[in-house]
Amino acid sequence: MLLRSERLRLIGKVDEVRKEGDAAIAVQKKTGRAPRQGVWPQHRVQMGAYLLLLEELHPGTEPEGVIRYARAERRVTLNPFLRYEVLETRDRALQVLQQRTLPPRIDDEKRCRACSLFSLCYDDNKMRELGYG
């Protein structure tokens, strides 16, 4: 389900949204393993963005998040710290886009392979074509 807010300057595609009482629950499925505790940091921020979007799109509901890993299910709750982290991450991303400067590339292709931008970051010709490097 596509979630979008011009005011928040956020957009995201969550796997599922369901209503349970006063709660709007975002469900995101991940194929990898779960960390020993909680959720991976990037998954927490991603889910936090979905929760901010749900909060705006469904006023009066309590947004909740569930991340389903291959063998575990973890809950994510929107709190002031996560709200700040999501908005700070959004602001940094907008700044990168406005300045047309990219953060330094991590020289660990194995770590990056799951990223949707992997082929772009590791294609030096494409990066030059876009005006980076």
Task: For each feature predicted by the language model, list its residue ranges.
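Mg2+/Mn2+-dependent nuclease catalytic core
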Residues: 1-92
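Hydrophobic/aromatic-lined pockets within catalytic cores
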Residues: 55, 98, 120
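Short cysteine/histidine-rich zinc-coordinating motifs and their immediately flanking basic loops
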Residues: 124-133
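Short Gly/Pro-enriched loop/turn and capping motifs at secondary-structure junctions
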Residues: 72, 121-122
